[in-house]
Amino acid sequence: MVELKYGLFDVTAADDSTQSCADVQPFADVSVLNTPDLDSLTVKPWETLETNQWFLDGSKLIFSDEPEKEVFGLWSLSQSGNDCNFAAPITLTCNFTKPHTTVGITLIFREDSNEYANKVKLQYYNSSNELIAEQDYYPDSPMYFCDKLVENYQKIILTFYGTSLPNRYLKLLEVKFGAIKIFDDDSVISAQILEEVDPTGAELSINTLEFTAYTTDFALLDPNGIYAALQQRQAIGAKIDGENFGTFFLDEPESEDDDTTTFKCIDFVGVIDTTDFMGGIYMNKNIGALVSEIMTSAEVEPSEYELDSSIANQIISGYIPICTHREALQQVAFATGSIVDCSRGKAIKIYPASDIVKGTITHDKKMSGHKVKYTTLVTGVEVTSHRYALQSEQSNAYEDTLSVGTYTITFSAPFASLTASGATILSSGANYAVIRVITAGKVTITGFQYEDSTSVVGIYADELPANAKANVISCDSNATLITPLNAQEVAQRLYEFYQNRYEDEGDILLGEEKAGEVWRMNSLNDRDLQGVIQHLDIDMITGVAGVKLTGSAKARES
């Protein structure tokens, strides 16, 4: 079964929201209600002495002796009566520091005991504390969407009048500022996921999800429809038969008619490719600190990336120019031989390539039409090493006539020890300076320029086979984290990879295979190919995936 869960959320509202409620148990914390995007709050199925709440089937847990250490969300002090209503309605207030827009509010109650509020009033207020919208709702399930497009609200008051079952506490787990739209087998027409990795680190691929579905909710020209509230980084969770196939983010929707919409989505690596990293000169920089610097600049939370400790503890030197955050991570990946990937999750994972074989793709999983290619022999690999040193004399990094204002000036080469005339430097780095001009006129920024001295480092075959021609691969000279300290190691690693000359491309019935993993594949003449899966093009409906595996030939294992 295909499930594509689309979070139509105001992606900034959760972090900007502060909740308060007077009618709440002392062990409950309403601040956890505002979970971001498609993240879910994990709450244990506690037993209570409420009417008919404790099922004697082993599904409930004995209530904690230290409930303050557990997660509850909003658990009210008041209990509903025999008529399911509270003696006094319970109010939850959500305050924001800036205006937001939403297509509605999704309320998530206790699914394990199928209980929820029986009536809710939502009131929206603007920045002047004026009521701009209100509506009553009557939930009929533990997850309920309060549908209403509201723009520029800065406070929401939710009033709960009772519970769906008598003599119950109100138990609200999450408040989502938007809608959760689920596309499944009944509505999805087609759905493809592309997963790619480059074991050399020469390219940092963007995984994609593209699907077409029957829906009338996304009329692109309807100013009152759901699309009117869409924002960047809307999350879409992809699952096949309950297994997580990743979290993607809306890139661009398009419609050919009134009933279908095609959603083109990218992974987190694609998201950070839309923003710039200002770079810098690095001398004996801890890679963990460098990656943290890149991620912080990209507004990626620590929980949204994973860096293997074997990489984090390494030291690196060199230079990163102004580039996208994705390109900055690619520089790190190439210099360290790391794989950077988001496959089957949301977080950006940075980890070393592995030679552990995960399993075998047997003939009965392969579709007809596989092509095996024996690539041209690589007899050598050359990389360009960079050494950065400050020039002994100052030079101009920038000179121009500017009017009054604040400017970000970028340089064509890295500089240090910057000074300015005609302006004040507010902040700066090796590649840029933010300046303020108070009086219009000539502005000059001077400093000591870093000079890049390059050399070529190569690894070559000791002997060529008979009739073989030299075939030396020259790697990108713009890999500026390659220095005399690591150039030999990088060239050796690349040379060894290029000795894997077999490529197998074709369709398979997808099982547990993932891009970036090492697998064996039954091939020709009772032999196997063993290597890295570099490419998986997954049809989510049929379970068939186009695969590309690069490796070497091995004897068939019995």
Predicted regions and their residues:
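Aromatic, loop-rich ligand-recognition surfaces of beta-strand-rich domains
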Residues: 65-133, 140-185
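An acidic/polar, Gly/Ser/Thr-rich interaction patch typically located in mid-to-C-terminal regions
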Residues: 85-90, 96-101, 107-130, 139, ...
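Short, Lys/Arg- and Gly-enriched loop/turn segments at beta-strand edges
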Residues: 167-168, 242-249, 526-535
